[in-house]
Amino acid sequence: MIPAWLEPIRDGAKAISADDLSRYVPPEGSNPRQSAVLMLFGEGPDGPDLLLTERAHHMRSHPGQISFPGGALDPTDATPVAGALREAQEETGLDPSGVEVIGVLPQLWLPPSNFAVTTVIGWWETESPVRVVDTDEVHSVLRVPIEELLEPTHRVTTVHPLGRLGPAFLVGEERDLLLWGFTAGVISRLFDFIGWTREWDTEVLFELEDWMLFGRNTPDEIPEMPEPNTQFQEGPGR
């Protein structure tokens, strides 16, 4: 049984659409690569929280980015749920048997990498120790309190070098880690959808630096983005 505070997440996952979550839809014939991530809610020492990872700083793309545990599906993964749990175990040492899956969000598309991502929502019913297991992919493992994500002064709007704007969060004890991109978008828009978001100042901007996006790549190697999904509606705080 999940705690009462998590019921809006469970119910929201059933009702939310891809158009509520993302501005891009995969074009016909894109043949995207399949991947899955785990959005795992638990109850930590500071109250309800989310399990997140900080990507290794030497990675070729998005080094140091805060993200859900997860990755590309393997041929042995029977379902996206199985893939998300496997990846979380490989990255953090999480015991999948302690996770109750309470929802699966609509599949979303990442145009630059042509990944179709399934977000699996879990309740950490029986907690297990977590740590960095794969140092090639993960720099640190974080438990970020939900209250920290809801605090308006922890919210900023990122500015991509190409001009795109996106929701983001300042996390960590010193608020020195930037949670942005796909993971921040899913969290922000799901929280918007279920009514958890508190009014925040969207005019507080954080300009993304090239190294945060490209790693060892150069800006010229980043693919051009397609036209956005016109059905996606920007709302307050997005």
What feature does the model see in each segment?
Residues V133-A168, E173:
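NUDIX/MutT-family hydrolases
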